[in-house]
Amino acid sequence: MKLKKTCIAITVAVGVISLSGCSTASALSGLLSDSPDVTAQVGAENTKQLAGVTAKADDKREVKVSDSNIGKIDSSVKKSVEVSTIQANTVNAESITVTKSGSWYDPVVCWILVFIVLLLFYFLIRKHEKKEA
């Protein structure tokens, strides 16, 4: 009887946790900023720009620019930039993608884990009831 009450309490607790949300990103949302990641495809590699530090090798390429009022161009392919906002008048790139952190598989994994825990408790209760009978 004591095991059954414990299993019911754990099942209710798991249900409350699963209904309140169990995203892996939500646990750190208070510590991290809510700004989206910005990815700009300019060359052969995507460069993520967000608030944080990443370590990448800096590979330089020679670029010749004509008819431009830009004095100096940093043409590195694997450049890591730390920014919190991006402001530009004109951006010329092959593609620019702005994404917000979070994915569809976090809730799916959470629900699968809840289902497995509920199945384990069900079989544990059945095994305990068979021993008592």
From Swiss-Prot:
Lipidation (N-palmitoyl cysteine): 22
Stretches assigned to the Cytoplasmic side: 126-133
Result of changing residue 22 to S: Complete loss of lysis
Residues with lipid group (S-diacylglycerol cysteine): 22
Positions in the Periplasmic compartment: 22-104
Keywords attached to this entry: Cytolysis, Host cell inner membrane, Host cell lysis by virus, Host cell membrane, Host cell outer membrane, Host membrane, Lipoprotein, Membrane, Palmitate, Signal, Transmembrane, Transmembrane helix, Viral release from host cell
Signal peptide: 1-21
Segments passing through the bilayer: 105-125
Name of the protein in question: U-spanin
GO-annotated cellular components: host cell plasma membrane; membrane
Keyword Membrane in annotation: yes
Gene Ontology BP terms: killing of cells of another organism
